[in-house]
Amino acid sequence: MRPRSHERHNLGGVGWLRASVLGANDGIVSTSSLILGVAAAHTSHTNILLSGTAALVAGAMSMATGEYVSVHSQADTEAAALAQERAELEVDFAGERRELTEIYVRRGLDLKLAKQVAAQLMAHEALGSHARDELGLSAESRAQPLQAALASAGSFAAGAALPLLVAALAPQPYLMISIVVVSLLSLLILGGWSAKVGGADVRRGALRVTFWGALAMAATSLVGAIAGTLG
């Protein structure tokens, strides 16, 4: 039997994976949908490419801004909680040790062992112990706004670049069908891959992402076709 210390689980990477896949999916769906809508309105190839480029830039900036603000708010909350915990340790160190002891008792340790663990951990790193076991914070899980913003913008841009590249290279008569096929295949692969890495059902994950992507493309194509007819 393999030692427990060597067991590997997928939970650690689920957060960043979800954010990356979400950004790429957004890039593919929003940009391909916009390009299809513009193309369905029978506009020029130049306008199609300009619309796709604008969608890539605007979407990436929007994702970066939203992610930065959101994660920075989380970082501010974490910093405030740590500052409060630091102040409480300075005022009532013994009380904080009792609080940590109670946490370990609730987790299943007997009182004597819980006291020993709390005393040793607080002697080594009092604030870190409370941050981890009371607040649920660790160095690995701390919010990093700039990193999150860059990752979100990068994943969106990577996804958006795919339909834009197809639009630039595909012959005009086959532009729409080429974008649909490439985008749906990409969504199918992304959905299945993220489900597999996350330990979920691959088929269900792939089909779910592909279905909603197809729905978005169909809706914007319909709007573009109607606009082209009315124009």
Model regions and ranges:
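Internal alpha-helical transmembrane segments
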Residues: 1-70
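The feature identifies polytopic integral membrane transport proteins across all domains of life
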Residues: 12-23, 45-53, 113, 144-150, ...
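Structural signature of hydrophobic alpha-helical transmembrane segments
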Residues: 173-185
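Juxtamembrane boundary at the C-terminal end of a transmembrane helix
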Residues: 221-231
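Transmembrane alpha-helical segments and their cytosolic interface motifs
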Residues: 16-34, 139-166
